[in-house]
Amino acid sequence: MALDEQLLSMELPFFYKQVFVEQNQSLLSSVAMSLWSLFHVTGKPKVFFSLGRLSNSVIDMLEVYNETYSRDFLSSSSSEEIGALIIIDRNQDYHSSLLTPATYSGLLSEIFDINCANLDLNVKDTKYKKGKVDFCIEEAAATSKNTTMILDSTTDNLYGEIKHRHFSEVLSVLSSKAKLLKNEDIKALGIKEMKHFVATKLQQVTLYKQNLVNHVLACETIISEMSNKFENLKISETDMLNNRNKKLNFTFVDEHFGTDIHIYNSLRLMCLLSLTQGLSYEEYNTLVNKYLLAFGYKYLYVFNNLVNAGLLVQPSSLKLSLNISSLGNLSDRLPRWQSSFQAAANKLKQLPSQPDKVGSSSPSYVFNGGYIPLTAVLCNTILTSETLSEALTKLSPLTELKIGGNVVANLKDGMETLNEKLSNIKLNSELEFGCKDVKSMSKMLKSDPNLGNAFPLKPKSVLVYVIGGVNYAEIAACDVVQTAT
């Protein structure tokens, strides 16, 4: 389903729960078939990049379809519309899902309910208010008629102009648009001009005015809901990402659970702190108890689901959990340790050293200059690299990255078929059929750095497929990369 310009969705709301929480991978065949069907129309890209166990499985399924269901009408030539395919598991970059976005479209999704690009503009009973402990009066909200906004750039040009902008710029843009409408002097038109205006432009102007009113109302609601919290969230989230001020960060989250607890956003802060700086046994139990006291023990299963999905790291036991913060000033004298996330993020340059000085030309502006989404890093690297070897060198910190497509297909002359691989497979070995590990290709790349002649990428277009869903901030970051390249 097309939700917006250059944005497609399978619209399976239960997909994430089934695949990541319940560990049921039966829907991956639907993902592979959707790509298989698309390639019947566009042709296959020259090179595939997969990141994550689920993405690797999808690439393998595509290769099985190639061998089993190959038909004459599937073009064997490379696609003239898509230069490369990136498939990435959602759990490879959970941080982009947990951070508070700074773009207009991202904040819309924070405050309002959005379903298939239809936004419920209910300013009295927003999604944000529904998540508070003191729930709003539901009866009054149910009787009022709500406005529905369609977040589609093809039908709402104004939304297309402001959707990826930093929220601080949106009100000034809307103000300038309102002044332009006010300056139009319809009274000065003659009879013929008036008839022409009514026949051709009146409906468009009326719709434009309504869209303008809706966007102004949405902005006012965002400001009223987020104004007091946005700056503190920005500072704490940036410190978490850069592994700074662990004690202050936990205090901030702990106070949030005590005074301003939210059924969703509080869990996001807890998960972000857990993934970036870790939680001790005591800290973990403190936050869990406060959440259950606020919302009830019927939500105890939520924490088990978060652990299963990889969003939350549960400390094993009190004996094995080392609470560094309890050692007082000693923690300040210890050398700073880095988690695997921070080590990889620094190598990939995802954490700008000066977030406050980042402009809109950097993809990190979508998170207030604090973090560049992994999808944007992948796209930028693939679009700017001159050879395959250069691209893989830049992406070397991603240990789970694999390659498929024509680059691997050219190496299959005389290789085993899938049935031969299955018959010869050994216990505890990993089956690589549709994609190959980067390390296994390193020797070949030394003799031929541009193996398969896939780089520089032509055409310069990349299809990004996120298994588990993508958010508006990541889309905005990829849009910055598209503009720059």
Describe these PLM feature segments.
Residues M1-T485:
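Extended, well-folded catalytic/binding cores that form a central cleft or groove in large enzyme
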